[in-house]
Design a protein with these regions (language model features):
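Metal-cofactor-dependent catalytic cores
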Residues: 2-315
């Protein structure tokens, strides 16, 4: 099914887009917060559960977020102009991914596309512009959490810029996912994902959704507040109770239906401050996430958001 041109919109004239969800758990939100919507498929009962407040793209994995007012919701994630969510990846010369877990200052690097050029910006660095399309560059085999994937190398100028910025003693490179290249199949890591689901460089799903209420609740348990940006979601919602997003089976946003697949595990990356690129551990955030939200202390922790995949274009 072709999802091209499907828009998820926020900031309309009344600055509100209704989020609907299917499932009996939604009824527990309470009167005044939930109301029913007429839908074309009588077997699914949709009720209003919240509003979309932010759309975020992270074009470069571990890079700075880009806030947008509209985005195309495609099978492999959000798209805005030439930007695709998590379609650029920093790697070592032998193809292993480099993320904010090893290099927290990556969160300060912004990647944008203007006039057919790829633009990189970072603190105390000159802006770098190179051609976005470099079809003569090599296709590189690389790995995201031991899953094989490919990317088009973005060239030596980009490599030198990133290596200098990170003050790395080892050369790093940037690759760009193109549609004909080998993609990840999330079902190889999590069997709940559809077998035909494909993503570029996300940890798992093409869409990650969380609520502002969940972050507010979490902050009551910390000695220093964290922001939604530390969790790097694609879609942020409000007007719902904390952690109710974990109960939503199917949701409709505008003309798109999304299906929840699994909760999002969390690691030390959540302790990287997106404003400074410094690891801060307020009451050790990842340990706090574990006991109160059903997890166990291990390398990844039960998070406060959920992985979704695009199901269909409704109209």
């Amino acid at each position: 099914m072709d999802f091209k041109g499907v828009l998820v919109k926020i900031f309309t004239r009344n600055r509100e887009v209704v989020l609907c969800a299917a499932g009996t758990a939604v009824a527990l939100l309470g009167l005044g917060l939930v109301y029913k919507y007429n839908v074309r498929r009588p077997e699914k009962k949709f009720t209003r559960v919240g509003v979309v407040t932010q759309l975020l793209l992270h074009p470069m994995k571990s890079g700075k977020a880009v806030l947008v007012e509209t985005a195309e919701c495609l099978r492999m994630g959000l798209k805005y102009g030439e930007l695709r969510d998590r379609h650029w990846l920093v790697i070592t010369e032998d193809g292993h991914m480099v993320t904010g877990r090893q290099q927290p200052r990556l969160v300060l690097v912004s990647l944008s596309c203007e006039g057919g050029q790829l633009c990189l910006n970072g603190p105390q660095m000159e802006e770098l512009r190179v051609p976005l399309q470099q079809s003569n560059n090599a296709v590189v085999d690389c790995r995201v959490f031991s899953i094989d994937v490919q990317g088009r190398d973005c060239g030596d100028d980009v490599s030198n810029w990133l290596t200098r910025y990170l003050e790395s003693d080892k050369t790093v490179r940037l690759v760009h996912y193109e549609p004909h290249l080998k993609a990840q199949r999330p079902s190889e890591k999590e069997p709940l994902f559809p077998k035909d689901e494909k993503v570029a460089y996300p940890d798992a799903a093409p869409i990650m959704l969380m609520s502002e209420a969940s972050v507010r609740d979490l902050n009551t348990r910390l000695n220093k507040d964290v922001s939604v940006f530390q969790f790097r979601p694609s879609i942020v919602v409000n007007d719902c109770e904390a952690f109710t997003e974990d109960t939503w089976d199917h949701i409709e946003i505008g003309q798109v239906e999304l299906k929840r697949v699994v909760g999002c595990g969390r690691c030390l990356f959540t302790t990287v401050d997106p404003e400074t690129g410094i690891i801060t551990r307020p009451t050790h955030l990842n340990v706090v996430l574990s006991p109160f939200h059903g997890g166990t202390v291990r390398s990844c922790y039960r998070g406060c958001d959920s992985h979704f995949c695009t199901v269909r274009h409704l109209r």
